[in-house]
Swiss-Prot record:
Cited function: Essential for the assembly of the photosystem I (PSI) complex. May act as a chaperone-like factor to guide the assembly of the PSI subunits.
Cellular compartments per GO CC: chloroplast thylakoid membrane
UniProt entry keywords in alphabetical sequence: Chloroplast, Membrane, Photosynthesis, Plastid, Repeat, Thylakoid, TPR repeat
The organism's place on the tree of life at top rank: Eukaryota
Protein name: Photosystem I assembly protein Ycf3
Membrane topology: Peripheral membrane protein
InterPro entries: PSI_Ycf3_assembly, TPR-like_helical_dom_sf, TPR_rpt, Ycf3/AcsC/BcsC/TPR_MFPF
Source organism (scientific name): Gnetum parvifolium (Small-leaved jointfir)
Pfam families: TPR_1 (PF00515)
Length: 168
């Protein structure tokens, strides 16, 4: 097993253990506990590549969760599942919904930028450099926002912004 996969499994197991502890010791209303349990189960299924099961759990968590901040993370994870499935338009919808509830979610901004960049690359392959530039400019704007929120992250994006003259 590759070391990175071992680390991911370790992190997933650690998250599950911590989530179970939180469910037991943190005072929450029964509905909040249920929502958190569905979220935890969704993350577990997602980490195992069980995307349909993950979505079912996330949708159930969304039905129960009322806190906008917590909902933003559920929406973000739904976006991740759609990204993993290659459903970029759906993923963008969920990233935008997550950002509406939590505008300082740099990972949603980063993933939105990645999809825009990917679409720019596709436009280049299709021989449409003008459309590619529009997508790349959008990617740059999302990356700048993500970098502003998390300056030490997204080094590759920072390099791309500098190389393409969009870092300013």
């Amino acid at each position: 097993m590759p070391k990175s996969q071992k680390n991911e499994n370790f992190l997933d197991k650690t998250f599950t253990i911590l989530a179970n502890i939180i469910l037991r010791i943190v005072p929450m209303a029964p509905t909040e506990k249920k929502a958190f349990a569905y979220y935890r189960d969704g993350m577990s299924a997602q980490s195992e590549g069980e995307y349909a099961e993950a979505l079912q759990n996330y949708y159930e968590a969304m039905r129960l969760e009322i806190d906008p901040y917590d909902r933003s993370y559920i929406l973000y994870n739904i976006g991740l599942v759609h990204t993993s499935n290659g459903e970029h338009a759906k993923a963008l919808e969920y990233y935008f919904q997550a950002l509406e509830r939590n505008p300082i979610l740099p990972q949603a901004l980063n993933n939105t930028a990645l999809i825009c960049h990917y679409r720019g690359e596709q436009a280049i392959q299709q021989g449409d450099p003008e459309t590619a530039e529009v997508w790349f400019d959008q990617a740059a704007e999302y990356w700048k926002q993500a970098i502003m929120l998390a300056p030490g992250n997204y080094i590759e994006a920072q390099n791309w912004l500098k190389i393409t003259g969009r870092f300013g």
